[in-house]
């Protein structure tokens, strides 16, 4: 949602109320805190809420070009389009600056924007102190504001930004319900126009660039994984394999020797007993064979455990690398939004394409 209004109307404080935490810098003075479009978000009520706080367009003494760039930034941050434009007003009066702000947005966004506007009055606590309802207050506002409310379909709400806890949640929930109902009324569509369509196409192109860069980084990381595993495990595996092969060779030699001994004994007269020395030799070789078998089993087990550990490390490294890549994919849109917000990278390219809409 996009917060619109003059300096001192309570836009930033309202944004903090909606998000449930202080993310925008707000001030009770008349000085401008928000000098440039900025976005903040939070997860509340089972959904992700993204808010764009806009500067007071006609009371910050900015050049016309700067004003146009700020509106463009609003487009870039909220593409493919916002679900609501919130006109934040003080209860006290509907000023010339606020009228011109609305006119400026209608000029660049078209009359269709009225279908997405919601008027939000701040300082509801003043109404409560006076024992007045919001309906009572609306009857006293200037005719121009009443006409604007009519064009907006009568969508109006009041906030007390001093509330905390459940009371704060209740008024935010009421606003979100109003927005949800209006989304249904608009057949599930967010606000959009030709300018938004072109901005979205440029943003998607930039997203692809970001994702492609992430893919290249992912491939390089895969190569780095293999190098790290090779460095950590190759020498250990070679050493264990050599020991295994050496022991296996010794075992095979012992087995051949035993077979030769047994063959020699078989050709002797079966009635003759072998010498005590021959018996001891056969027993000794048998014990050596059993020792080597046991050693071979241990070496094989150690080698398999090391290979298993190597594979586990590989899978874990690849899992982390893949998760990092997925996060980069999911965050590609946020990266583009930040570039627009901070007037870096993509901002200049997109502004050069879209500034004709503001001429």
Where are these regions (language model features)?
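C-terminal non-catalytic interaction/localization modules
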Residues: 1-51, 58-66, 77, 96-116, ...
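Glycine-rich, N-terminal phosphate-binding loop of Rossmann-like dinucleotide-binding domains
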Residues: 89-90
């Amino acid at each position: 949602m996009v917060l619109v209004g003059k300096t001192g109307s309570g836009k930033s404080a309202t944004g903090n109320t909606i998000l449930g935490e202080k993310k925008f810098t707000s001030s009770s003075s008349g000085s401008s805190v928000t000098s440039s479009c900025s976005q903040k978000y939070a997860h509340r009520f089972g959904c992700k809420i993204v808010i764009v706080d806009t500067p007071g367009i006609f009371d910050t003494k900015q050049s016309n070009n700067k004003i146009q760039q700020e509106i463009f930034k609003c487009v870039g941050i909220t593409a493919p389009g916002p679900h609501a434009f919130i006109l934040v007003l003080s209860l006290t009066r509907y000023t010339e600056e606020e009228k011109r702000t609305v006119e400026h947005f209608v000029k660049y966004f078209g009359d269709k924007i009225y279908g997405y506007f919601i008027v939000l009055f701040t300082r509801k606590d003043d109404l409560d102190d006076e024992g007045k309802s919001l309906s009572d207050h609306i009857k006293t506002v200037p005719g121009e504001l009443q006409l604007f409310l009519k064009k907006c379909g009568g969508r109006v709400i009041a906030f007390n930004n001093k509330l905390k806890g459940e009371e704060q949640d209740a008024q935010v929930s009421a606003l979100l319900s109003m927005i949800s109902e209006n989304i249904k009324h608009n057949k599930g569509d967010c606000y959009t126009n030709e300018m938004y369509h072109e901005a979205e196409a440029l943003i998607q192109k930039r997203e692809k660039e970001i994702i492609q860069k992430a893919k290249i980084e992912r491939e390089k990381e895969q190569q780095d994984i293999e190098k790290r595993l090779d460095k950590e495990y190759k020498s250990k595996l070679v050493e264990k394999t050599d020991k295994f092969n050496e022991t296996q060779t010794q075992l095979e030699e012992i087995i051949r020797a035993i077979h030769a001994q047994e063959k020699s004994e078989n050709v002797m007269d079966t009635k003759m007993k072998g010498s005590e020395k021959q018996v001891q030799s056969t027993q000794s070789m048998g014990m050596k064979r059993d020792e080597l078998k046991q050693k071979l089993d241990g070496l094989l087990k150690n080698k398999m455990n090391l290979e298993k550990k190597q594979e586990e490390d590989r899978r874990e490294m690849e899992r982390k690398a893949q998760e990092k890549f997925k996060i980069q994919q999911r965050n590609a849109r946020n990266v583009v939004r930040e570039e627009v917000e901070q007037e870096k990278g993509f901002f200049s390219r997109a502004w050069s394409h879209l500034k004709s809409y503001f001429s």
